[in-house]
Amino acid sequence: MAMQFYASPEQIMRDRSELARKGIARGRSAVVLSYAGGVLFVAENLSSALHKVGEIYDRIGFAAVGRYNEFENLRRAGVRMADLNGLSYDRRDVTGRALANSFAQTLGAIFTEQSKPFEVEICVAQVGVTAEDDELYRLTYDGSVNDEPGRMAMGGQAEAIAGALKSNHRSDMSLGDAVKVAVRALGSVGGEGGAARTIAADQLEVAILDRHRDGRTFRRVTGAALTALLDDGAAAASTDAPAAAADSADVEERPDSEAP
């Protein structure tokens, strides 16, 4: 008769945590922060087809690192939940806090009940009337939820990136300044010999939640509009830069939410 191997519950949880952390660390990082005109998402992403940043509802956005198929399934489930609640009750009843709690329950159940946890780290962000009203929620692979103070970094070197963000971030920054701070923070790690890196515009995924818009606020910033924001020689962006950028072909007007 074969001998049955025993592993304590504590060891099983440690092994699952280690698996999830290693999976998250292999991916490239992302940052989310408040600025004068809304909430900014910046992710290092070499793929033009797979998005790490997306929309969930009118004033709610989503960013993630880790396994794409896992966090995209969560985002789609969040879109369906938000659409259902908005149609059944009122669009104002759909909140980032409720969606974060729903994601946390799903991630926690998978972590404790399944043999393999999701290798993901997620941010759910809701833009407010002012920067002080913005809500940023960090969700980890085990279902833990943390309310972040206006800025956050996700990924394998999140602590170092968060340190760079903390020293330079201000909630009253323009969009141009916020993008530069975010990109510098992402480039502060991963360089050869610990040196800072320069990240090209085509390696970045950038989106905003524009607090000055009614209805759907999520917009992507791409192409010439993004290059102009990254250009040190360009004029400083004003707080209404998102609305101006939306008039160009480089900012996508179609939100990537699903129909109910």
UniProtKB/Swiss-Prot annotation:
Residues 237-260 are annotated as: Disordered. It is found in: Cytoplasm. Its main location: cytoplasm. Signal peptide: none annotated. It holds the Pfam family Proteasome. GO terms for molecular function: threonine-type endopeptidase activity. InterPro entries: Ntn_hydrolases_N, Proteasome_alpha, Proteasome_alpha-type, Proteasome_asu_bac, Proteasome_sua/b. Component of the proteasome core, a large protease complex with broad specificity involved in protein degradation. Belongs to the peptidase T1A family. This is Proteasome subunit alpha.
